[in-house]
């Protein structure tokens, strides 16, 4: 059996809350979007485990000026307590002088997820930069 509508909506909410958490500097919520041994894979950057993810969230927020992650075209598949998510993403941040919002990264998320204790979490979130 495929995912229920409730599961699909919960996964969409997870993706949205992840973006809000990383953009607002809520590193605990950012890390909480992952399973305990979850992995953020951004090519040469590999972050694994809740503590490392939380530290990354703190570092990212202090280095980016007014970041905004925008994910679109979400495609969710799966069954039971396992799922995959694919989405396009653009990141905006203040840049230049005078500062203005600019696209600073563009690419694709390819994710594996698991439902743990009734809540969906990222097992692995892979970000591939557009070439």
Positions of PLM-derived features:
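Short, low-complexity N-terminal intrinsically disordered segments enriched in polar/charged residues
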Residues: 1-28, 32-36
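Charge-dense, low-complexity intrinsically disordered segments
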Residues: 5, 47, 100
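Short, conserved clusters of charged catalytic residues that mark active-site
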Residues: 13, 71, 108
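A solvent-exposed, acidic/Ser-Thr-rich amphipathic alpha-helical stretch
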Residues: 27-91
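A generic structural micro-feature
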Residues: 65-68, 101-105
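Short beta-strand edge/turn micro-motifs at domain boundaries
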Residues: 84, 106-131
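Short, cysteine-centered beta-strand-loop-beta hairpins and adjacent loop/turn segments enriched
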Residues: 92-102
């Amino acid at each position: 059996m495929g995912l229920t509508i409730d599961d699909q909506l919960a996964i969409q909410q997870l993706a949205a809350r992840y973006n809000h958490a990383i953009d607002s500097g809520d590193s605990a919520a950012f890390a909480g979007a992952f399973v305990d041994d979850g992995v953020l894979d951004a090519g040469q950057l590999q972050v694994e485990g809740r503590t490392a993810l939380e530290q990354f969230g703190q570092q990212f927020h202090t280095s980016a000026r007014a970041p905004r992650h925008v994910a679109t075209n979400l495609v969710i598949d799966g069954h039971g307590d396992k799922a995959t998510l694919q989405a396009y993403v653009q990141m905006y941040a203040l840049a230049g002088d005078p500062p203005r919002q600019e696209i600073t990264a563009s690419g694709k998320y390819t994710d594996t997820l698991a439902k743990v204790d009734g809540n969906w979490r990222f097992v692995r979130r892979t970000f591939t930069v557009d070439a």
